Amino acid sequence: MGNLSLFLKKNKKEKKNGYYAATKSLCDDNGKPLEWEIKALTTRETDAIREECSKDVPVAGRQGQWRRKIDSTMLCRKLLVAATVFPDMHNAELQDSYGVKTAEDLVAAMVDNPEEYNNFVEFVQEFSGLESMDDKIAEAKN
């Protein structure tokens, strides 16, 4: 048998935050894209976000049957907000400057280029240890 004390939380290695330039449209004085501080999301965090973005909907033509539906747009936005340490997506001044009232709308306004947005989502998923959507699609095709 192994040493159970090695499994205690105090022995668990924590992943350090990373940095990612989410958009080329926000740059420093030298024209270099600003790096955002990103944390890896935990299983509990991703589960809670997935649950928050899910709802039961009736199955068409099948009375009394329901299926689970995920709002994938909101799921991605909430994952980005939860993973972003800096800039603070909940900052009222930042939200006001973009004319939005929620952190989820702010991240979409700040990273408004679809390709950059998709790359940001993929980075956060991979940094957090989640499979990217491309990986899941490729796996499903095989």
Label every model-predicted segment:
Residues 1-16, 134-142:
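Low-complexity intrinsically disordered segments
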Residues 16-31:
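Short acidic-hydrophobic surface loop/beta-edge motif
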Residues 11, 23-24, 102, 121:
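Generic alpha-helical secondary structure signal
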Residues 30-142:
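Short, surface-exposed, charged amphipathic helix/loop patches that serve as local interaction elements
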